[in-house]
């Protein structure tokens, strides 16, 4: 491809609305352009990288035995109502009515559609197992789209769905997809971790997220220093409170704490550690108030609490609800003598804890020496907090938990019979008996994978693409392009690389060398051959590797050979 005939609208200035580096660089490198909030045009240069990821995904899906199909983006409401997700999914599901007033939605995912297809077409165990996948544009009405392709409303996704006769078969399908995902992200040149994850709105019994490691990542990743345990923050487990010394309960007493609302203020005012203060949090679960208790130095994990309660919606209570439940303003709530009968859930960290401080359910007042069982009751002790650095590993005896940042690029789910039971997707077994199909689903954010790659591969000059997903593998910077010898040599190298199957961009523009070099660094093509009159007089060209910055002046044939070898090595499967 000749640069002069291609469309790469690079810009020097960083757009003001871009926050993360991938968004900034994809805009500056002419890969994407914003159309509306969370909706982007994929320009030719960016689309080439997208297509590279798609090709790797297709190869690995096909290798794992999955079969490609394509489903509609528009889905009828009745399928979502049948599965129970029409209301559960919330406002992120874009809903609309057609001219006949029939209800539809733009699909953010396709569990209902694929299950409907299978229940109509699969009759016998002989037709199973089967794994179907698609690569398609989807829409999720994010409340706050941001970070470019990292959190858009319209996005390209690969989603696959497996169907098996039993749970053992579903486990085999899950493991195949898990291994395929590892190969996909390894081939894309990414540093990543597979972590245990919450199943969220998709549902099911078990899942893993594939997280690209990056300081800018939205998600926290938890891993053990001694074993293979890894999970995202929503899923990461804690142990029962450790280091709690037994103490005889002391008499509970009211203490005046004027203006002391925060945990830190109360602890300082009373001369205790914040570990001895218990937070009383009032939330609303499916319209009903609930109280969560957690140690003062920890944060509530709302996903864990939501899963424990089995509710569809969970949010922090408004001030008027707090007053109704506790009789006190926010900041002075406590579990003793609540004004309303509500469920009280205590975090594991409180089990065995004695003589702690809580709000007194009265303004400017707290209670000291509070004890569970004597002073109030709880429905149970449950893991409902976020882990912190240094927590004991839940899976081994020697490890401590570490926390990293990551970007989710893939997610695999063991669904079990969640959708097949709701939509009555069954088959006849070898004995002619009707059985429920076991399912799995597996997603990869294609555009997000490219963005995550850039988050992980860049420097102050621009993008540094790994060869497997680079829009082009080599760029030829033709200096003094009007000079016949330089032009002829550039053309000759270009043709030889093309014939060798190298994806090459010939920068034949009539621009200054510095301008061309800056563009080449910005767009991140891995290998660059510079053809200039001075080196060419000796039959040589300059070869530069984008990642290392290493520059060699080599005979033309040797430079071409090195490019071929580098590309061949990078693309080995």
UniProtKB/Swiss-Prot annotation:
Main location, first listed in the record: cytoplasm
SUPFAM superfamilies: Class II aaRS ABD-related (SSF52954), Class II aaRS and biotin synthetases (SSF55681), YbaK/ProRS associated domain (SSF55826)
UniProt-listed InterPro entries: aa-tRNA-synt_IIb, aa-tRNA-synth_II, aa-tRNA-synth_II/BPL/LPL, Anticodon-bd, Anticodon-bd_dom_sf, Pro-tRNA-ligase_IIa, Pro-tRNA-synth_IIa_bac-type, Pro-tRNA-Synthase_IIa_type1
Reactions mediated catalytically: tRNA(Pro) + L-proline + ATP = L-prolyl-tRNA(Pro) + AMP + diphosphate
MF terms (GO), sorted A to Z: aminoacyl-tRNA deacylase activity; ATP binding; proline-tRNA ligase activity
HAMAP family in the cross-refs: Pro_tRNA_synth_type1
EC number: 6.1.1.15
CDD domains on file: ProRS-INS, ProRS_anticodon_short, ProRS_core_prok
GO cellular component, one term: cytosol
Function of the protein: Catalyzes the attachment of proline to tRNA(Pro) in a two-step reaction: proline is first activated by ATP to form Pro-AMP and then transferred to the acceptor end of tRNA(Pro). As ProRS can inadvertently accommodate and process non-cognate amino acids such as alanine and cysteine, to avoid such errors it has two additional distinct editing activities against alanine. One activity is designated as 'pretransfer' editing and involves the tRNA(Pro)-independent hydrolysis of activated Ala-AMP.
PROSITE patterns named among the record's database cross-references: AA_TRNA_LIGASE_II (PS50862)
Protein name: Proline--tRNA ligase
Subunit: Homodimer.
Sorted UniProt keywords: Aminoacyl-tRNA synthetase, ATP-binding, Cytoplasm, Ligase, Nucleotide-binding, Protein biosynthesis
Cross-referenced Pfam families: HGTP_anticodon (PF03129), tRNA-synt_2b (PF00587), tRNA_edit (PF04073)
Domain notes per entry: Consists of three domains: the N-terminal catalytic domain, the editing domain and the C-terminal anticodon-binding domain.
Gene Ontology biological process terms in this record: prolyl-tRNA aminoacylation
Similarity remark: Belongs to the class-II aminoacyl-tRNA synthetase family. ProS type 1 subfamily.
Organism whose genome encodes this protein: Citrifermentans bemidjiense (strain ATCC BAA-1014 / DSM 16622 / JCM 12645 / Bem)
Localization per record: Cytoplasm
